[in-house]
Amino acid sequence: MKADIHPVYEAIDATCSCGNVIKTRSTLTGPLSLDVCNECHPFYTGKQKTLDIGGRVDKFKSRFGAFGATKAKQD
């Protein structure tokens, strides 16, 4: 194997927008800024919102449900 072909893998601090600091290793130099982390992301904190899209489906079916259906023959 060739010597000195791999980048330096150093310990850095990744700082989240909420102030949480995570120590990690990377080829990047200097501190890293994160938008979200496990301390502030809604999925991990349990504050996630569940969207109810059932109303949209019902609205679509009411508008286009009969589209393409054959008309009943009149006697």
From Swiss-Prot:
Protein name: Large ribosomal subunit protein bL31
GO CC term (a single one): ribonucleoprotein complex
Cofactor(s) needed for function: Zn(2+)
Cofactor: binding details: Binds 1 zinc ion per subunit.
Subunit composition and interactions: Part of the 50S ribosomal subunit.
Annotated source species: Pseudomonas syringae pv. tomato (strain ATCC BAA-871 / DC3000)
Biological process, per Gene Ontology: translation
Functional note: Binds the 23S rRNA.
Sites where the protein binds Zn(2+): C16, C18, C37, C40
Annotated InterPro entries: Ribosomal_bL28/bL31-like_sf, Ribosomal_bL31, Ribosomal_bL31_A, Ribosomal_bL31_sf
Keywords: Metal-binding, Ribonucleoprotein, Ribosomal protein, RNA-binding, rRNA-binding, Zinc
Keyword rRNA-binding: yes
Family statement: Belongs to the bacterial ribosomal protein bL31 family. Type A subfamily.
Pfam family, one: Ribosomal_L31
